[in-house]
Amino acid sequence: MTTSCCQINCGGQGDIAINVQHTKPPKINHDLVSNVCERPSVVARCPVAAIRPALVNGKPSLEVDEKKCICCGACFPPCPPMQINDAEHSKLAIWVGGNHSNARGKPTFQKLVASGIPNNPPRWPEATAVVKKILKTYKEDAKDWERMNDWVERIGWPRFFEKTGLPFTKYHIDNWRGARASLNASTHIRF
């Protein structure tokens, strides 16, 4: 199991990952930006070009185009004054089926199975309930030594949602046109 502070998921490709899901663009503390942040790096870090340099009260700062912002959180590590964490609007998402290893097959990417889960520390009861539901179903149905991704691949994603009782929504459909069937996930060279 892995955790990550945003959907970029540097936590890796664990069997189950719990990630923070930001739902609002960052709030900028303009007084600190010029002293703390290297502005060109922050602008370059945004995957959708939603951040641009600005002057606020005569000081160099940054501004966010909220229509473009996808709330990924990539701007926060290089510029902490761009606070994206929010007690009310930051939610949790659970991803399943990742595997970096290529010992028995190619590596697999995680898939979103639950999103918009309330972020209620310190025990996170809603997230814990979803993870327990997944683990209980996995324990009952998986073969010995079968990883989560192998189990899901064997039964299929529709059966996974059916067995776990998790709701299937339009956000679970991988419809990104830029992906190929394998996303060249294998470490083997192909010509």
Predicted regions, residues:
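Peripheral terminal and linker regions in Fe-S/redox and tRNA-modifying enzymes
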Residues: 1-191
